[in-house]
Amino acid sequence: MTIVLLDNRGFASIGGLSEAVGSGGFGTRYQYRNAATSELDGDALPVDLAANAASLGARVWRADTLASFREALAEARSEVRPSVIVVPVDREARVGGYDSWWDVPVPEVSTRREVQAAREAYDAARRMERDFL
């Protein structure tokens, strides 16, 4: 079994969704609490997912180029134990939009303008929903 682990230093996918609905991606980055602000916007936490995988018995490669990824994948194919290829990725990179909508409810009441705007967009999108059953 080969696992390709995309390391974005947090939970980037759910963070992007959280930001899209006005919640700012709370708690989706591996960061220390800032002593001055008490927010989770301090230095990066040193989470080593490769070391974690190795501690569980996996053979691990770190691939930061396409060439090193291809090499790791070729080696992993002949490995008899679980294999993990860790690929650091840009957590801010996003895929383009698409012509569909994911019904993720947004709070109806909030003091934050970002959430209020996201709720207005949510309500407008809900009005355009089509039932298929």
List each language-model region with its residue ranges.
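Thiamine diphosphate
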Residues: M1-L133
